[in-house]
Each structure stands twice: as C-alpha cells, then as structure tokens.
Amino acid sequence: MSSVRRRVLLAALVASVMASPEAAMAIEQPEYTVVRQDGAFELRRYAPYLLAETEVESGFMEAGNVAFGRLFRYISGDNTARTEIAMTAPVEQAKRGGGEKIAMTAPVEQAREGGVYRVAFVVPRKYDRDTVPQPTDPRVRIREVPARSIAVWRYSGRWTEENFREHERELRGKLAALGLKAEPGDSAIIARYDAPFMPWFMRRNEVLIPVTEPAASARPAP
C-alpha cells in the first residue's frame, strides 16, 4: 500500500469517528483511575486491556504509517470473524526493547527513530481473549496488557519525534523528582488521540511510561 493511500485511509477512518470534539470524547479508551495529578503530569492505574499490535522495522514516522495500514485492515474486517471492529483511542506506538514501548483506542502510541516499533490499537472492552476476532494477517497479533501503573505527560503539538522526546525528558525528570522508577525494559510510548487534520495546537498527545510504583489512593478518571 502506498504512503499516499495509507494517509487517505487514516484520514477517512479518524474523520468518521472524530469529526467533532464531542465525538472524540465518546471514543472508547482503556479504563484507568488517576492516582496523582500535577499540571501536565498524571500517575494512572490502568485496568487490563487487549491490544491488536504489529511490529515494523523503520524510522519513527514511517513505522507508524506502515503499521496503521495493517491495523486498519484488521478492524475493517481482515479477521477471522470478517467483522468490523469499532475504533478506539489512543493509538499506541513504542520502540521494542531498549527501555521504550508503544500501544490504539483513542491515542496513537509510538517511540524512537530507527529500529523495530510496536504500534497498537486498543481492542474494545466488549471483547475478551476468547471472543476477540483473530487477525488473518500473521503480522498482526492480539496481546493482553495486564493491570499496571503508568506515568503520563500530556502535551499538544506536532507528532514529531523531537516533540515527543522533549516531553519524554520532562516526564522522566518528574519521575526522578518523585522517586518513581520506570518498569525494566519498557519504552516510552507516544499516545495520539486526534485526527491528523486537528490543528496541532489543539491536539491531545501523551507520553506514557509504565512505572513500578503501586497505584494507591486512586480516584476515578474524569
């Protein structure tokens, strides 16, 4: 699939479910509770959820483009049930190994230039391991993410690696100040929640880093 066609598919899909801020808010996302919040920083406790993910060996941006085409075909009926699966957020992407990772329901997640990237869509909660349609493309797999604590840094702006890395540094600085430790082997994830035609200054982007700190004294997410 050409890069032009992938961009058209991405725009058409996201436009159909995120045509307005109200629609974007209605997109299903993984369940979580907020443990701590301070400006752009949050510590969240996520419930278990399923991902449809694929790996691409390429640069930061191209990996996301290639992976999106595979995952889009999966939720469009390229699965054993031949059924369409609802769009979720975010789309997650992260670099495999090297202490960095990524995951899609309402953001798109992604991590560092050059290497193997994992890009994923979040599977709607109505499915479990036994009922989720299985991919027919062997490059796409279903993976269960266990309950875990995630440190989050929210930001707006363009989906460049430079922008992502700048805010990753801010998040890691916050973790050091709080005495929180990243999970061994986990990469920083970029989570993207908005359509590409959303003005860059209005986009919701997040850096996600799994941490070992137990999530206590949680309150429900808004």
Regions found by a protein language model. Give the residues of each.
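A solvent-exposed interaction/effector surface
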Residues: 2-222
